[in-house]
């Protein structure tokens, strides 16, 4: 970049750090339940960020047809789209056991609920619940998120995969339900015990172990 401003003059300036991803900065359109976000993503040939994938029933239901809208609009406008650029968003806190996860989120889940109930007050994100145990049960029973073991997290991701027909990225919604140490441990368990289940990195060694045990 060569440019002159009131305070700086640049001569063939360039960034010293390469981007984290190939092809430049990824762009995406946010969507909850309406077709608007999906239509825009298809029109402009960019990613789709489904921020209502788990928190609202309408957002989960929309996963069944949103990508079809993206592809339809892409065909109409001559753009290219890829399911790998579809990101689903949802809150999770996992621990070694469900009991530990439930204990962890007592740190901050109540203020999170109160925010959606009293401050943000989004009509499409009305979340009931008065006591902490009730709040945890609502999150888990409604599929709005995950508070539990890695197995519960795997079930949730599979549920989203089946509903959507496939997507590229599962993005954890920041929530501060637990303290920083427990939150870090949750991320470690997600990386070690949930993500490999779907990406298949461990399958070759697991398959060999199964074969060896059958001899």
Predicted regions and their residues:
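Active-site-adjacent structural elements that line small-molecule/cofactor binding pockets in enzymes
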Residues: 1-215
